[in-house]
A protein has these predicted regions:
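A binding-site-centric feature that preferentially detects glycan-recognition modules on secreted/surface proteins
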Residues: 1-226, 232-306
Length: 306
C-alpha cells in the first residue's frame, strides 16, 4: 500500500493543520502507538450572545444587522400579558383556541427550559421571544388562510394604534398563490395546525441581516423543533403589534417559509413612517424587488414548536 494512497484526498495544508491541532508531540505519540485516542464531537454554538443565528458556511447573502432596528422584549409577568395576546387573537380572528393564559404560560416555560438545556441553541432566548398560539387551520388553501390572517392583522394593528393604517398590497391576490418552501419545516407546523391549535415560541429577528434565501438555507442545521417562519409571523403580528410594529425602528419581517407564485418570491411586513401625513404605518407586500440581496434591517423569524 503506497504512502500516496494512504493520504489520498488530503492536502499538505490539511495534514499540517491536523498535526497543529493535535500538537506535534501528541501526534508523534499517536503515530508510535504510545497513546489511545478518544473522539468527542464538538457541538457548535448556533446563536451568538445577542440571540442572532451565526451565519457560518452559508452561500446566500448575509450582512451585519443594523441594531438601531430592534424589538423591545416586554416583561411577561404573570398571566396578564399572555391573556392580552390571546384576547387579540380570539377577537380579531373570531376564534376560540381553547388555550388559556395559564396553559400557554406553562407550555412556554416548558419550551424555554428545553432551549436552556441545549447549549447549541440556548443563546436564542437572549433575543426577543413571544408566546404564540397558532389557531386550528380550517381552509385547505394557504392563500385563503393568509388573507384571513391579514384581515386580523389590520384589525389588531389599528386597534392598538387608532391613528395609523395597515396597507395590504396583496389583498385579494393570495388565493391559490401561496405555497410552502421545501425543507423549511413549515409543513410540520401546518400539519399540526390541521389537527388543532399549536402553542410555540416565536423568535422575530434571530436572522436579521439574512437574505430570505439565507433564511431558508440555514434552517437545515437547526434542531428539528425549529421551523422557519411564515404563517406564525402573521399570527405573532396579530397578537403583538405593539412589539412587532412599534414604529419605523422595528425590523422588517420576512415570511421566508412561504412562496408567492414562485419560490423566488416571498412576503414581508414593513413598519414605515409616512412623512406626508406624519404618521407611522404597517405595510405587507411581496419580496420581488428584494431578492437576492441582504438588508441590515430585514429579518426572517423562527418558530419553536410546542
Amino acid at each position: 500500500m503506497s504512502e500516496r494512497w494512504m493520504i489520498q484526498g488530503w492536502t499538505n495544508g490539511e495534514l499540517n493543520a491536523l498535526v497543529k491541532n493535535l500538537g506535534e508531540e501528541t501526534a508523534r505519540k499517536i503515530q508510535r502507538g504510545e497513546v489511545k485516542v478518544s473522539l468527542e464531537e464538538v457541538m457548535k454554538v448556533l446563536f451568538d450572545k445577542h440571540g442572532r443565528r451565526i451565519p457560518e458556511g452559508l452561500r446566500a447573502n448575509v450582512c451585519d444587522p443594523n441594531r438601531d432596528f430592534r424589538f423591545d422584549q416586554l416583561e411577561l409577568i404573570g398571566k396578564a400579558y399572555y391573556a392580552n395576546g390571546i384576547k387579540r387573537l380570539h377577537d380579531t380572528l373570531e376564534v376560540d383556541t381553547g388555550i388559556s393564559a395559564k396553559q400557554l404560560k406553562r407550555e412556554i416555560e416548558h419550551l424555554l427550559a428545553i432551549l436552556r438545556e441545549n447549549s447549541q441553541v440556548a443563546n436564542i432566548i437572549n433575543g426577543v421571544w413571544l408566546p404564540v398560539i397558532m389557531p386550528k387551520l380550517e381552509a385547505d388553501d394557504l392563500g385563503t388562510t393568509l388573507e384571513q390572517y391579514l384581515e386580523a392583522v389590520g384589525k389588531s394593528y389599528t386597534d392598538v394604534f387608532p391613528d395609523r393604517k395597515f396597507n395590504n398590497y396583496l389583498k385579494g391576490k393570495l388565493v391559490d398563490q401561496v405555497s410552502i418552501v421545501d425543507n423549511s419545516r413549515h409543513d410540520q407546523l401546518i400539519k399540526r395546525m390541521r389537527q388543532g391549535p399549536v402553542p410555540g415560541i416565536h423568535f422575530p429577528n434571530p436572522l436579521q441581516g439574512f437574505s430570505f434565501q439565507a433564511d431558508r438555507e440555514q434552517i437545515v442545521t437547526l434542531p428539528e423543533r425549529f421551523v422557519l417562519s411564515g404563517l406564525d409571523t402573521v399570527i405573532a403580528m396579530v397578537m403583538y403589534p405593539d412589539i412587532l410594529a412599534r414604529n419605523y425602528w422595528t425590523p422588517d419581517l420576512d415570511l421566508a417559509a412561504l412562496s408567492y407564485q414562485s419560490t423566488a418570491d416571498s412576503f414581508y411586513f414593513e413598519a414605515l413612517y409616512d412623512v406626508v401625513v406624519d404618521e407611522d404605518e404597517l405595510n405587507f407586500g411581496d419580496t420581488a424587488n428584494l431578492a437576492p440581496h441582504a438588508y441590515n434591517e430585514f429579518s426572517g423569524s423562527l418558530f419553536f414548536l410546542g
